[in-house]
């Protein structure tokens, strides 16, 4: 969790995470995060999720937004429907053949297929904003899918996910059955299909939770928890917010990446070695174990090297998350009228590493580096705090310099006009 929740974000002056849980954020972090499910009833939460998704919004996405695969898939009884059965060309001027075909989806849906709309954090404006706030709250990359299930249909058989999930019930009722993990904290390369038999056996045992979600309810599922869901009565819609949490394994993976700098470890094994003979390979395994142990011991006393490992995690996070979108036309208009009274703010969710050289300060972004004179350092630190400020308030810069710097950072997508 972020150390400071911004109470002004999210509807109803609650943080994005706060809207999804019936306990306070610290209790969630200490007692539930990655440990056990949390069921939060609508009566325990302050508001519905109608601002995020509705049945009308689903129809709009299907019929009027030109959504293409892989942003959608359909399934029935655990089997995926070939995309050719629910996509088609959009006709003259839009000949791409993988666009959603609303009539074909109607037919498949009426036949009992569940529709999954994927990547809604990149498609649907309310969810773009909400997920950006949630990433700030929870500190891990997040994404959103929507599951639209026909009456009394089960979209997918019992399975587990390799990411944490928040389930938000939008409309209709859906029965959820949960069982404890057969593999705790699975990594992304450890899917449930690798343990299909164990999952099926666990799924016939007495459930940890058997409940019906109604509109406005929310359910948190740590990764690895086995679950299945069945629509009851009318069509049901729920959102799943998937959270791809960074783990200690990620730290270890980046730590071991340091070992590639060791020339001896990069040496080839002997020519003629029989790699199928474990006894022949074992001495080299033992030697590498000793070498790695020695290098790790050296890392304990090398704070700069450990810091570089931490920075690698930050770069990975920046690479797989996205800051708030910018409005190109609005920004250009704002830049043209920029003066010392204009208010700017750091672009939400934008990660920048700071370095200095040759009287310059460098902002390392995901896809480029922005360099400015060293006298901008205090102003950059001020802006990185995330608080809006007027151009005239930029620390250490005179009026003309402040305007030049603000305009440059707006153009580079580092700053945005303050609301």
Identify the residue ranges that each predicted region occupies.
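Acidic, low-complexity/disordered tracts enriched in E/D and polar residues
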Residues: 300-383, 407, 418-419
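Long, charge-rich, low-complexity alpha-helical segments
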Residues: 2-8, 13-15, 20-23, 28, ...
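Glycine-rich, charged/polar anion/phosphate-binding loops
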Residues: 223-227, 348-349
């Amino acid at each position: 969790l972020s150390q400071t929740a911004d109470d002004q974000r999210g509807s109803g002056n609650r943080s994005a995470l706060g809207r999804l849980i019936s306990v306070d954020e610290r209790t969630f972090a200490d007692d539930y995060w990655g440990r056990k499910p949390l069921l939060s009833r609508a009566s325990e939460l302050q508001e519905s999720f109608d601002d995020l998704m509705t049945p009308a919004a689903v129809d709009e996405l299907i019929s009027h937004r030109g959504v293409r695969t892989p942003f959608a898939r359909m399934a029935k009884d655990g089997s995926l429907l070939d995309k050719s059965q629910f996509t088609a060309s959009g006709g003259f001027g839009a000949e791409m053949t993988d666009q959603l075909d609303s009539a074909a989806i109607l037919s498949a849906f009426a036949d009992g297929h569940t529709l999954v709309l994927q990547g809604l954090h990149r498609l649907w404006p309310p969810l773009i904003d909400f997920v950006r706030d949630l990433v700030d709250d929870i500190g891990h990359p997040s994404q959103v899918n929507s599951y639209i299930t026909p009456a009394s249909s089960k979209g997918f058989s019992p399975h587990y996910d390799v990411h944490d999930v928040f389930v938000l019930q939008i409309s209709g009722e859906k029965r959820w059955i949960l069982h404890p993990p057969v593999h705790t904290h699975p990594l992304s390369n450890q899917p449930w299909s690798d343990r299909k038999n164990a999952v099926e056996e666990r799924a016939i045992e007495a459930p940890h939770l058997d409940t019906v979600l109604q509109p406005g309810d929310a359910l948190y599922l740590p990764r690895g928890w086995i679950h299945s869901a069945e629509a009851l009565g009318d069509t049901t819609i729920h959102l799943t917010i998937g959270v791809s949490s960074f783990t200690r394994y990620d730290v270890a993976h980046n730590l071991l990446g340091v070992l590639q700098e060791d020339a001896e470890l990069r040496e080839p094994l002997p020519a003629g070695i029989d790699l199928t003979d474990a006894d022949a390979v074992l001495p080299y395994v033992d030697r590498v174990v000793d070498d790695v142990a020695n290098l790790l011991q050296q890392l304990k006393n090398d704070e700069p090297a450990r810091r570089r490992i931490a920075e690698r995690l930050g770069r990975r996070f920046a690479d797989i998350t996205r800051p708030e979108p910018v409005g190109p036309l609005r920004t250009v208009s704002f830049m043209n009228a920029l003066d010392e009274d204009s208010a700017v703010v750091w672009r939400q969710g934008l990660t920048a590493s700071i370095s200095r050289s040759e009287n310059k300060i460098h902002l390392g972004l995901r896809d480029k580096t922005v360099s400015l004179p060293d006298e901008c350092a205090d102003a950059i630190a001020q802006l990185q705090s995330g608080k809006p400020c007027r151009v005239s308030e930029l620390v250490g810069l005179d009026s003309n310099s402040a305007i030049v710097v603000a305009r440059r950072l707006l153009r580079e997508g580092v700053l945005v006009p303050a609301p």
